[in-house]
Every structure is written in structure tokens, then in C-alpha cells.
A protein has these predicted regions:
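Core segments of transmembrane alpha-helices
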Residues: 57-62
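C-terminal ends of transmembrane helices
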Residues: 65-66
Length: 129
């Protein structure tokens, strides 16, 4: 069982990011607009036209695919790490809603990523030396 948990966690985390990226890149879901004049509206107004959101979603797609493949999981975590940190920062500072961190989608993403980092901590130890 211990052998399969990281694989299951990697597949679930990868699929969450793959689905998120595909939905945005191929315009499968229309996102409701944020309230006018809010920090979120200004944030997304800057991200949309510049193409930065597309860049982030391509990273999410690539990282999600890599996390689902056990041999490439750590590379995928290296790509997804900054994305996850930015999602957390968005909820804390832009949306100004710390309760957003217990979102039913965001909480499992954070927990799965932390679990996979813990499982692969020996592989990441070389980066700290």
C-alpha cells in the first residue's frame, strides 16, 4: 500500500492541474467576471491581454503531465511548486481571503503536493547542499 500511495497522489495532483489548464487553454469553461474595481478584476485585467495566464497554464499542463509519471514526478513538482505558491499568494493578498485556502480544490492540491514533496524529500535534499 505504501508503494502505491505516491503514485495515486501523483495521478490525482497531475489530473487536477491538467484539467485546470485544459479548461482555460481551450476555453471550455466561462469564468464569471470578478467584481468591478476589485483587486481581482485589476489582477486578471493585467494577466489576460499580456498572455501571462496562458504561460502559467502551459506550465500547469506540463507540470501536471510530469507529476503523473513516477520517474518524472520530481521535475513536475519543481514546475508546479511556484504555481502553487502563487495560487496561495493570490488567495492571501489579491483576493484578501485567507478562507480561500480551505477551498475544496485548493486544499487537496496543497496537501497532495506537500505529501509528494515529503515522499521525495531525499531526492530534493541534493538541491539544498
Amino acid at each position: 500500500m505504501k508503494k502505491y500511495c505516491p503514485n495515486i497522489a501523483g495521478i490525482v495532483l497531475g489530473l487536477l492541474f491538467i484539467m485546470s489548464a485544459v479548461m482555460v487553454l481551450f476555453h471550455l469553461v466561462k469564468m464569471p467576471p470578478p467584481p468591478e474595481g476589485s483587486n481581482m478584476a485589476m489582477f486578471f485585467a493585467a494577466f489576460g491581454p499580456t498572455g501571462y495566464m496562458t504561460f502559467v497554464k502551459i506550465f500547469e499542463l506540463t507540470g501536471g503531465i510530469l507529476v503523473t509519471i513516477p520517474r518524472l514526478r520530481n521535475l513536475g513538482l519543481l514546475l508546479l511548486g511556484p504555481v502553487i505558491v502563487n495560487i496561495i499568494a493570490f488567495h492571501l493578498f489579491v483576493a484578501a481571503n485567507p478562507k480561500g485556502l480551505i477551498d475544496p480544490i485548493l486544499s487537496p492540491i496543497i496537501m497532495l503536493a506537500l505529501y509528494l514533496l515529503w515522499v521525495g524529500r531525499k531526492n530534493f535534499a541534493g538541491l539544498l547542499n
